[in-house]
């Protein structure tokens, strides 16, 4: 199939050499802006579907780019954006159909009473606005967040992102932010190993219930609880059953509202539902969406209830976002949602996700370096460990696998989690069975190499230990021989 720019008769701009690109980046881009594969970064010049191509034409299978939700440069999405850009793009203070059609389609996917939209340009902006809505509605300040959470790069959302503020050099957490344990039943504060018979959802909800009770005792309550429906940076975490129901009840009893951050996991990725929060049978008060919504184009939205939206309007301060809800962004978002429906991508994510989980669990039975496999749809995490019984994370192996998958197998994956030992899979939704098998084949080779290296290290250590024992025994024997010789000389001298 021709690339999208070829279908539209567009001519790609002339490329710099990779060396020149790196040189200019080092000169003009802040060093805090990190790259994948920093020792040998990829220069990507084209994309198509689930594939990306470097400057030499090498094709890579993309297993991490949930930004390109329906596939890189999907022709219908590209066409919709190009057509609207060639027609008109302006701010949303003028009437235009793409905005209202986008809002209608987006809210039609939401449960009642989530029916009012505010459009933004990114997940960070969406979460920032969600906190504003919550604090305005409740007239409170305090926010509960989860450990290892990441909600964006703006100051307001960095404050509720332990993934960032707990790093070396991170700013201290404000007193009005309360951090509860991430509901990770494999490697978190409470594990299914420690509490094999416990209700893990209730157990992890308890710290939040205690925070709410303390806030009420002080006469303050809380403004909001914010959480990703499935935590991504925390290591592809699926909360235990009943967790969000118990948490939402506690937060609302303390006067707060519940914010679902769907920036990473929304728009059908989990397969069983359009939104990941639906897997827990809860209805948030505010939902934040972005990233996959624009398939690589900057667009996002906050969806909330008429009551919360009206309270925001009642302040008398108009909300205006120059690019939020512009015609081009909305045309692209509309095209993305059409493609999800027309190509049945949600159902495909369900079927393929089940296949990936099943096959990764087969690998777990074969390779001791896999501690846990978890996921929903095309959101999968594979936790690598040094010791399965003790669940000791293996960050070194995870990094080695990520780089070997790229260099040898031309498959792009990443690692994350508090110990950076979880292999993450979040591919474009056009990912297919053949792609899954390609990943599995390369991953198997990497795991085989990891285990062979461990065996070699263990054998080497055992040989070194044996050599040490032999050397010690030899030295002891020599010492005893010398002792006997001295005793013999003494006897003869007498």
Swiss-Prot record:
Task: Cite the Pfam families for this sequence.
Answer: Aminotran_3 (PF00202)
Organism superkingdom: Eukaryota
Q: Which residues carry this modification: N6-(pyridoxal phosphate)lysine?
A: 291
Q: What is this protein called?
A: Alanine--glyoxylate aminotransferase 2-like
Q: EC no.?
A: 4.2.3.-
Q: Name one GO molecular function term.
A: transaminase activity
PANTHER family linked:
ALANINE--GLYOXYLATE AMINOTRANSFERASE 2-LIKE (PTHR45688:SF13), PTHR45688
Task: Please tell me which top-level EC class this enzyme sits in.
Answer: lyase
The keyword Lyase appears for this protein: yes
UniProt xrefs under InterPro entries: Aminotrans_3, Aminotrans_3_PPA_site, PyrdxlP-dep_Trfase, PyrdxlP-dep_Trfase_major, PyrdxlP-dep_Trfase_small
Q: Which GO terms describe its biological process?
A: response to nicotine
Which UniProt keywords are listed?
Answer: Lyase, Pyridoxal phosphate
As cofactor, the record names: pyridoxal 5'-phosphate
Tell me which CDD domains the record gives: OAT_like (cd00610)
Protein family? Belongs to the class-III pyridoxal-phosphate-dependent aminotransferase family.
User: Source taxonomy lineage?
Assistant: Eukaryota, Metazoa, Ecdysozoa, Arthropoda, Hexapoda
């Amino acid at each position: 199939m021709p690339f999208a720019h070829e279908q539209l008769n567009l001519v790609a701009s002339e490329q710099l050499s990779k060396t020149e690109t790196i040189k200019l980046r080092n000169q003009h881009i802040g060093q805090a802006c990190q790259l994948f594969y920093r020792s040998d970064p990829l220069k990507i010049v084209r994309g198509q579907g689930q594939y990306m191509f470097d400057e030499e034409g090498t094709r890579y299978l993309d297993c991490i780019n949930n930004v390109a939700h329906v596939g890189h440069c999907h022709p219908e999405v590209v066409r919709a954006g190009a057509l609207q850009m060639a027609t008109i793009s302006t701010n949303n203070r003028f009437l235009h159909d793409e905005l209202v059609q986008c809002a209608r389609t987006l809210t039609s996917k939401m449960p009642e009473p989530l029916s009012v939209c505010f459009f933004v340009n990114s997940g960070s902006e969406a979460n920032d606005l969600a906190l504003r809505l919550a604090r305005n509605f409740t007239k409170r300040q305090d926010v509960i967040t989860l450990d290892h959470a990441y909600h964006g790069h703006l100051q307001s959302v960095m404050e509720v992102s332990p993934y960032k503020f707990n790093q070396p050099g991170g700013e201290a957490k404000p007193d009005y932010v309360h951090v509860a344990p991430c509901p990770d039943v494999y490697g978190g504060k409470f594990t299914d190993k420690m509490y094999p018979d416990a209700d893990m959802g209730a157990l992890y909800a308890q710290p939040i219930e205690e925070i709410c009770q303390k806030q009420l005792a002080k006469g303050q309550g809380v403004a909001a609880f914010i959480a990703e429906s499935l935590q991504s940076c925390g290591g592809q975490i699926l909360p235990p059953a009943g967790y969000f129901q118990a948490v939402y009840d506690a937060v609302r009893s303390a006067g707060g509202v519940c914010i679902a951050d769907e920036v990473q996991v929304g728009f059908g990725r989990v397969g069983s539902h359009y939104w990941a929060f639906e897997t827990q049978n809860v209805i948030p008060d505010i939902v934040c969406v972005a990233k996959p919504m624009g398939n690589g184009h900057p667009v996002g939205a906050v969806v909330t209830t008429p009551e919360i939206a009206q309270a925001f309007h009642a302040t008398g301060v108009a909300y205006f976002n120059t690019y939020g809800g512009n015609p081009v962004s909305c045309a692209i978002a509309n095209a993305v949602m059409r493609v999800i429906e027309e190509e049945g991508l949600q159902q495909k994510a369900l079927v393929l996700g089940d296949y990936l989980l099943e096959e990764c669990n087969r690998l777990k039975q074969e390779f001791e370096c896999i501690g846990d496999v978890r996921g929903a749809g095309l959101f999968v995490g594979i936790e690598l460990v040094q010791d399965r019984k003790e669940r000791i994370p293996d960050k070194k192996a995870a990094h080695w696998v990520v780089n070997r998958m790229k260099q040898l197998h031309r498959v792009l994956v990443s690692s994350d989690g508090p110990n950076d030992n979880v292999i993450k899979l979040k591919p474009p939704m056009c990912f297919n069975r053949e792609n899954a098998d390609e990943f599995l084949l390369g991953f198997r080779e990497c795991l085989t190499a990891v285990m062979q290296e461990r065996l070699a290290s263990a054998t080497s250590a055992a040989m070194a230990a044996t050599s040490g024992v032999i050397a010690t025994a030899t030295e002891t024997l020599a010492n005893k021989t010398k002792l006997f010789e001295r005793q013999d000389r003494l006897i003869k001298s007498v």
